[in-house]
Amino acid sequence: YNHSHIHTQYFVTYVSFLLLFTSTSLNSPYLSSPVISTGQHIDVGDEDYHDGDDDVDYTDDVDDVDDPHGSPSQLLQGGYQRNRHYGGGTYHSGYYRPNKQHGNGYGGQYPKKYGSGYKH
């Protein structure tokens, strides 16, 4: 029995589990809940007034990038999406909640792109 074949089977199972976890977290009402604001805000323009009542992407604040506040799926899968005003970056696999100005029209319920690793 080929030893490398065992590793291949294990790897395929592992990848399948990751894909299952990703799709589950994207559709879970708990993991895709709105981001909780820390009350801190660095103004990035008049596109987002953080009064707590509107559909604002709090992950676009510079002070939230290294802050452990965000949707649980972001924390579980790693990686915040930095706002385009500050250079953007790679879309990490996981949940991304678009803000009002750059939103995709779905109110932040769906990821910006359906493939992981999409780059601007």
From Swiss-Prot:
Residues 45-66 have a biased composition (Acidic residues). Belongs to the immunogenic miracidial antigen family. This is Immunogenic miracidial antigen 5D. InterPro entries: Miracidia_Ag_8I (IPR026240). It comes from Schistosoma japonicum. Residues 41-120 are annotated as: Disordered. The gene is 5D.
